[in-house]
Amino acid sequence: MAVSYKVNERVLCFHGPLLYEAKIVDTEMKGDVTTYLIHYKGWKNSWDEWVEQDRILQWTEENLKTQKELKNAAISTRQKPTSKKSASSTSKHDSTGVKTSGKRSRESSTVTVDGDSHELPSRIKTQKSESPIPQQVKRDGTTDAKNEETTKPENNEKDDFEEEPPLPKHKISVPDVLKLWLVDDWENITKNQQLIAIPRNPTVRAAIAAFRESKISHLNNEIDVDVFEQAMAGLVIYFNKCLGNMLLYRFERQQYLEIRQQYPDTEMCDLYGVEHLIRLFVSLPELIDRTNMDSQSIECLLNYIEEFLKYLVLHKDEYFIKEYQNAPPNYRSLVGV
């Protein structure tokens, strides 16, 4: 039976793979789906976000125990030393459809997104990124900690402590062209109340597949190919899992709900384009920090992501839309603007 939550109710809410104490600030109906404005205890209001019910748990002893178990698991994972050797795996296809070979041993680590685990192998000799990707890039080059303006709760009572989540340990170097594009994207949607037409063509999956074809012939051996395939498959997984939870601006959520109803059996990577994918790289360093991936796997993944971003810049005319759509009046009334 679905649980409904009330304003000011104390709850637990998933942010990444961990549960945090939070309270319900506001509620809103999007079609037949209830969304909740969440304020995380101890976090500034810039971190408030609209979430659906599947990210919220009731404040119960059982769920508090789950919160503690998840936290302890994350701590033990970070303290665990990287294994230098791993047993040979048997030939099989993993859940992403990418074949792994039993003819060799390789290091691997598990990436968990919203409860689903997927393996990514680790590799060495990758380059670290040099500059952080801002959570919101302004035209003057400065950054803002929030992705769009959020409604502050009327009750501005102080929490027991004022603390924001730590900055990600890892960084993704985003080309300036894409940083400026993110700014324009934010303005078009949140200020101009425009939308990107969905379904998009080419899609996220198509863009990643095209990059794969351009890259794979330059890899040196079968192991490098396998690592690259796993990394690209992982990127698709992250996008599918994160889109509805953290990649949409409030003005887009109604469109997202309509798309889900219209295409119930289609993955989001086959409907959305790179315009939404590049938003993922704002939050990806933080998400990666919370996985149990070893440092070699992380550096390998980030290296391929940065190459992919450079590829998108070279082919920006092919992958990025030229014009946004004006939202019709009935859509604006549904959104409440």
Swiss-Prot record:
Belongs to the MRG family. PANTHER family: MORTALITY FACTOR 4-LIKE PROTEIN, MSL COMPLEX SUBUNIT 3. Residues 137-158 have a biased composition (Basic and acidic residues). Component of the NuA4 histone acetyltransferase complex. Heterotetramer of alp13, clr6, prw1 and pst2. This is Chromatin modification-related protein eaf3. Coiled coil: none annotated. The keyword Hydrolase does not apply. Component of the NuA4 histone acetyltransferase complex which is involved in transcriptional activation of selected genes principally by acetylation of nucleosomal histone H4 and H2A. The NuA4 complex is also involved in DNA repair. Also involved in deacetylation of histones, chromatin assembly and chromosome segregation. May act as a transcriptional oscillator, directing histone deacetylases to specific chromosomal domains. Residues 6-56 form the Tudor-knot domain. Residues 166-336 form the MRG domain. Keywords: Chromatin regulator, DNA damage, DNA repair, Nucleus, Transcription, Transcription regulation. SMART domains: CHROMO. It is found in: Nucleus. PROSITE patterns: MRG. Residues 70-169 are annotated as: Disordered. GO terms for cellular component: NuA4 histone acetyltransferase complex; nucleus; Rpd3S complex. It comes from Schizosaccharomyces pombe (strain 972 / ATCC 24843). InterPro entries: Chromo-like_dom_sf (IPR016197), Chromo/chromo_shadow_dom (IPR000953), MRG (IPR008676), MRG_C_sf (IPR038217), MRG_dom (IPR026541), MSL3_chromo-like (IPR053820). GO terms for biological process: DNA repair; DNA repair-dependent chromatin remodeling; regulation of DNA-templated transcription; transcription initiation-coupled chromatin remodeling.
